[in-house]
Amino acid sequence: MSNCAIVGINWGDEGKGRMVDLVTADYDVVVRYQGGGNAGHTVVNEFGKFALHLLPSGILRKGVVNILGNGVALDCESLWTEMSDVMDQGVAITPENLKISDRASLLLPWHRDLDSLEEARLADKKYGSTKQGIAPFYSDKYQKKTIMAGELLYPEKLWDHLAGILEWKNLTLERVYGAKPYTMDDLKAWVAEFGEKIKPFICDTGAFLRQAQAEGKHIRLEAQLGSLRDLDYGIYPYTTSSNVIAAYAPVGSGLPTAKLDKIIGVVKAYSSCVGEGPFPCEWFGEEAEKLREAGGEYGAKTGRPRRVGPIDIVATRYGIQCQGATDIALTKLDVLSYMDEIPICARYELSGQETDAFPFPAVLPDAKPVMTAMPGWKCDISGVRKWENLPEAARNYVEYVEREIGCHITYVSVGPERDSIIIR
């Protein structure tokens, strides 16, 4: 038996989905332990290209049981749309290979409305929400003003609970934002259209996981986004509304006593970011556009162009410390092949002093990157499958990053395909 978490080290979009897809061949269960449909994992395999937002990445592997844990923001509408799209591409999804925690709270229709209304109110002070309802959902969850997926199995209790929440929520919609209220008929129609579709997948996943653990099954846990978007340890307030770090994995998965034997942190060979907030190494203009095009840096959920720049050693080292990573997967090394020199942010300058420490969020906008560079390799490496066959300059770059971040780089990806990963 082993428990392994795969997590993002930076701002998200590091390539976690394809790493889970790769290593899940050796695992029996994959659990998504936090977040909602506001970010995506991209996986390329024999069925095609998939942008997964809520479904665990193990859904693309036969024989793997996939679980949406109690820490997930369960958006029935988005989940069913995603399930339908994946099934249309030839992937089977049944209650045998997808299980939804009865303790996962439901993202309700008004959560999206409130997200958009608040972003509009904030105007130029907005945080860059994806408008998927995530912040209003988690706010309601911690106010105990939402419902659990398991309540869909008990309709009479569900309607009584929803009626009380509806009255309270309409006060916010009408009196704070001047928006249209919801009715019970609206909610019943929503449950009939989307809630009923996911009911066959809802069960006591905690009991399932405890049994799997007792049987010595291998369990993988995955999250969305990265360390710098964690609610407590990220660049607040430009974070998501949940804890993405590996320490939360046992709690959000439904197996709170689990010990993590391995934590694989995923780092991109350069930096990218979607949304607002400080991004010390950001490039602009032609330089940024060239890297963005080379890496296909557009949000899997929103399609928005990602902000890009060179690898940030300071932020990466901090992200690894937050996650407690035991191994690193360095992704998209091949994207850098067009560069004559590979730029690296080695340190920050803050208040006239150079520092290796990641600053407190309030002063991070004042940090300036201190740059260095290494020779590029200027050749296609997408077909390389052995470490020793990489150009010397590429190996030197990987080894430099490894030394600076203080964690072994076990995996190096050189392309989007399932087999385009070098294991060191």
At which residue positions do the language-model features occur?
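Non-transmembrane, aqueous-exposed alpha-helical and coiled segments at domain scale
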Residues: 1-424
